[in-house]
């Protein structure tokens, strides 16, 4: 007997990462894909969003490819080749996920599904192919060894075939009989029949899996075409600036609706806060100038956001407010979160977190806690606005604190300071 051979596949992990990068490049467009293709015509879930399923496919492929690459096959530790059975089941997860991505994105794989280059098994009726033969092997050897019946007239003529064992050939007495890597026996459940031999060659199995995995390239190209087409479609639909008879809050609501359609609803809360800012009127006249500057900053950000929606792009000064922003955010989002890392705020991380208790959505106890934490910052924030802790409402204190944080950001090296124009209508005079 010869020394036992082992087998190990290598699937390029970069292939799934490249596909994932295509998804992420225009995630807001990818999220709009639904189960609408003809293949889902009779499914109860036809028409619902497919984003979760797409993400599941990507995660399953990524994890399972890593697992398959780590498996060394051919170690006969039990009666049957359980390592191969496990390998086939997990490889099927990858191939099924790729098939699902093709169906969702509308990629026709009929030609690829008819391919016979790996196994060369066209079947008794000439209608077989690599895809069907792989599924037959998995059914017979792994998942349905006591009842394989879906491949009648293709890979068997009996109504049912069964498989008592699957064993590695090399390094065993069987290699003197069978010139293959694995041998399985398929009983056909007929009188006076010894059944049929099924010979498995690992180079053929690996070749088929690698080919089906490579179809991610074709599916990725189709995804990019879908994204480009959808973006161009949106660009052709006008998004008017604020109309003469349109209130500012109505204008913000309209842009919010447009963004939800084109980019998703991730920025809904930012639009809601923009409306709150533009409708805010301070109680103290001492704060009116600072409030107006803050409103103007939001108006400027909304102008940029209008460009984002019209051009379907978040990059560049005319959209994000600055070039090469590593955060991936636009000014519109920076204003909402106002994350300025500077020495004067460095010791107040907990306080800044609790200021959110004053936004009107928290309970009375939390709001009281927010007031305490705001007072502790009065020595910093009070340089920019006037707080009246006795008479101001929670929401007014919250809005004033946000205005103070905005003006602090204008004094430091951060995205907001870089994006806001050097104009007194946005910035306090020195």
Placement of each model-derived feature along the sequence:
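Short linear interaction motifs
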Residues: 73-78, 109-123
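Short, contiguous, well-structured surface segments enriched in hydrophobic/aromatic residues
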Residues: 39-71, 80-111
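Generic structural signal for short, solvent-exposed loop/turn connectors between secondary structure elements
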Residues: 74-75, 103, 128
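Short, well-structured alpha-helical interface segments that form or flank functional binding sites
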Residues: 79-96, 129-136, 326, 330
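Acidic, Ser/Thr/Gly/Pro-rich intrinsically disordered interaction regions
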Residues: 2-52, 119-430
């Amino acid at each position: 007997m010869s020394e036992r051979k082992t087998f190990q596949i290598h699937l390029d992990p970069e292939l799934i990462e490249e596909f994932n990068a295509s998804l992420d490049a225009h995630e807001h467009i990818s999220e709009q894909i639904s189960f609408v293709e003809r293949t889902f015509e009779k499914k109860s879930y036809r028409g619902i969003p497919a984003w979760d399923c797409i993400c599941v496919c990507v995660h399953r492929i990524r994890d399972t490819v890593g697992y398959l690459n780590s498996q060394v096959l051919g170690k006969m530790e039990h009666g049957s080749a359980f390592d191969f059975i496990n390998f086939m089941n997990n490889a099927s997860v990858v191939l099924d996920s790729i098939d699902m991505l093709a169906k969702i994105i509308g990629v026709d794989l009929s030609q690829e599904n008819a391919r016979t280059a790996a196994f060369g098994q066209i079947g008794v009726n000439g209608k077989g192919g690599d895809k069907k033969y792989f599924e037959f092997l998995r059914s017979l050897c792994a998942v349905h060894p006591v009842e394989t019946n879906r491949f009648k007239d293709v890979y068997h003529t009996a109504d049912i075939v069964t498989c008592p064992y699957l064993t590695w050939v090399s390094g065993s007495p069987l290699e003197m009989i069978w010139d293959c890597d694995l041998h399985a026996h398929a009983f056909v459940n007929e009188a006076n029949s010894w059944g049929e031999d099924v010979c498995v060659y690992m180079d053929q199995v690996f070749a088929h899996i690698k080919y089906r995995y490579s179809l991610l390239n074709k599916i990725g190209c189709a995804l990019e075409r879908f994204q480009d087409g959808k973006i161009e479609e949106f660009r052709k639909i006008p998004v008017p600036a604020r109309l003469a008879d349109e209130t500012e809050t109505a204008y913000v609501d309209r842009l919010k609706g447009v963004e939800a359609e084109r980019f998703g609803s991730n920025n809904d809360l930012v639009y809601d806060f923009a409306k709150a800012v533009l409708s805010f009127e301070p109680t103290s006249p001492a704060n009116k100038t600072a409030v107006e500057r803050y409103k103007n900053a939001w108006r400027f950000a909304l102008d940029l956001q209008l460009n984002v929606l019209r051009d379907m792009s978040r990059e560049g000064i005319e959209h994000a407010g600055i070039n090469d922003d590593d955060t991936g955010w636009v000014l519109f989002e920076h204003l909402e979160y106002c994350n300025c890392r500077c020495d004067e705020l460095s010791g107040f991380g907990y306080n800044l977190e609790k200021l959110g208790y004053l936004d009107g959505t928290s309970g009375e106890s939390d709001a009281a806690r927010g007031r305490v934490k705001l007072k502790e910052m009065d020595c910093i924030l009070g340089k920019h606005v006037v707080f009246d802790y006795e008479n101001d409402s929670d929401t007014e204190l919250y809005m004033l604190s946000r205005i103070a944080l905005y003006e602090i950001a204008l004094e430091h090296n951060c995205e907001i300071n870089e994006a806001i124009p050097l104009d007194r209508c946005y910035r306090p005079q020195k």
